[in-house]
């Protein structure tokens, strides 16, 4: 059975944000059973964990001797067993992969710039000066994303794929603000994707682990 590493507990602002949610969601979409290896704070810095994940992050996926880190790689691995995530059609499959990579490379770095300021440095003078520029940059990317989405329900048209899964989790990083949801098209897109039963099961599973540890 697949095992996913996750934190046993994180502060409330980070709950529903930790990257193991991406792996859990993908597994739920694929209908694959899994179990979690819950880490206490500090476990991620231990030598045995760093041997598997050099950056000390979650999640790690383990299955039959295979160890994978990085949520993008993990979602693609799971997607190999799910036509929902990675369609059989070669073109659609490539586009799903394209959007997954776009979420991680073209959107997430700009989203994280704002999130780090808001969640960790909001009262610092340098952050107050830096935030308007960071918001401007992310809004440019979000505007381009919204334009590409257009009136389609999902990034590649009528079907949800791994690209939508990854993009949604990236956009949710800014759920504490209206930077994303001020765009009605993107707000509706997030609502549509998070209404999926697989997302709800994944989210509830992550939050359930945190509640058990509280």
Model segments located where?
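GST-like domain detector, emphasizing the conserved glutathione-binding G-site
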Residues: 1-129
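Short, solvent-exposed turn/loop segments enriched in Gly/Ser/Thr/Pro and often Arg
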Residues: 40, 162, 206-207
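Short beta-strand segments
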Residues: 6, 166-169, 204
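GST-like fold's C-terminal all-alpha helical module
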Residues: 103-195
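Long hydrophobic alpha-helical segments typical of transmembrane helices together
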Residues: 185-214
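A generic structural-conservation signal
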Residues: 36, 87, 158, 183, ...
